[in-house]
Amino acid sequence: MVCTPVEKSPNLLPTTSKANSKAGLAPLLLTVVELIRQLMEAQVIRRMEQDCLSESELEQASESLQKLEEQVLNLCHIFEIEPADLNINLGDVGTLLPSPGSYYPGEIGNKPSVLELLDRLLNTGIVVDGEIDLGLAQLNLIHAKLRLVLTSRPL
């Protein structure tokens, strides 16, 4: 089988940049990065309130979080993605991220989000144990036995 690059063909329809911003990996990856950024921000707030961070650590963390947020917004601009579109509505489960200003770590929000659940799990700690078989065409190609410890505390 020979693979050749796709050439410009009259049969291919050009896509608009708006259509491209809804497809591909960029929106998904930016959503994951934003979720992780907000989780880290919640952990910094929790540690700050527990006086577990020095002034320099707090300053470094806040500067890093601010730069990461700027990069997410910059990449949204480059890929023509509305930052609000990073918050996925998961139906009955709620939204992936809380609406701006509606969640503060340690407090119960009006409309819980997946981020709030993950933040609480990190704060409490959880162990997930299981097996995964990955494959295709009815072939199990990868077998994994996993134990995941999810916590914000040192192990």
From Swiss-Prot:
GO molecular function terms attached to this record: structural molecule activity
Superkingdom classification of source: Bacteria
The keyword Transmembrane helix belongs to this UniProt entry's keyword annotation: no
Pfam families for the chain: Gas_vesicle, GvpK
Keywords attached to this entry: Gas vesicle
Subcellular location: Gas vesicle
Any one cellular-component term (Gene Ontology): gas vesicle
InterPro entries per the UniProt record, alphabetical: Gas-vesicle_GvpA-like, GvpK
Function: Might be involved in nucleating gas vesicle formation. Gas vesicles (GV) are hollow, gas filled proteinaceous nanostructures. During planktonic growth they allow positioning of the organism at a favorable depth for light or nutrient acquisition. Cluster expression in E.coli (gvpA1-gvpA2-gvpC-gvpN-gvpJ-gvpK-gvpF-gvpG-gvpV-gvpW) allows cells to float and produces irregularly shaped gas vesicles.
Family per similarity comment: Belongs to the gas vesicle GvpK family.
Protein name: Gas vesicle protein K
Species: Nostoc sp. (strain PCC 7120 / SAG 25.82 / UTEX 2576)
Gene: gvpK
